[in-house]
Design a protein with these regions (language model features):
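Glycan-recognition and catalytic cores of secretory/periplasmic carbohydrate-active enzymes
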Residues: 1-184
């Protein structure tokens, strides 16, 4: 039964609308691989999804675009939720042997760390980047109480994302970030 519903997610590989493929495939196919060890069925879909997410990456900005829809004059919106998608790239790199996928995850995590957080380790929900030169056009909180407030769900995404990036890379800066985010 689980395979029946998991396989229904394969059409997501044709969607180019947002970053959610990371949540959707890692939570389904990632767990399928962990629970069944069926690399023949799982790995091709998992790696294809990692490539689909990687296609949303701007080397100039160093981050993965979250949404294609543009409102509020957005050009290249990146939301903190995207930290939850990086595991698709790191595991995809391990499964495929393609280190470029892990490099994209590292770039996104490091750029997000540099730009998304206030001095008190609360994060903005959304940053809009200039994809040509990587500059931050503006910061806002689309979900949450106010632009300057902490948004608990976003904090949770960041905490998980940096903990996972430490696990995957061993880089102490990611662990320190996770601890600071958790202590905010």
């Amino acid at each position: 039964m689980a395979w029946k519903y998991t396989r229904r997610l394969e059409p997501l590989l044709d969607c180019v609308c947002d970053h959610d493929i990371g949540f959707q495939i890692n939570c389904s196919y990632g767990n399928a691989l962990r629970l069944t060890g069926d690399s023949t069925t799982v790995v091709p879909v998992y790696v294809a999804a990692a490539h689909k997410l990687a296609d949303r990456f701007s080397p100039q900005a160093g981050v993965i675009k979250s949404w294609n829809f543009l409102r509020n004059d957005w050009v290249y919106p990146v939301i903190i939720d995207n930290m939850m998608n990086l595991e698709l790239l790191t595991v995809g790199a391990r499964l495929s042997g393609e280190s470029a996928l892990a490099d994209i995850a590292g770039s996104h995590a490091s750029t997000t760390l540099a730009n998304h957080f206030r001095d008190d380790w609360t994060s903005w929900h959304l940053l809009d980047y200039d994809p040509e030169n990587g500059s931050v056009r503006y910061r806002e909180t689309v979900q949450g109480y106010a632009h300057g407030s902490a948004w608990s769900r976003g904090q949770a995404w960041a905490l998980y994302g940096y903990t996972m990036m430490f696990r995957e890379t061993g880089k102490e800066g990611y662990l320190e970030a996770a601890m600071n985010i958790g202590d905010m």
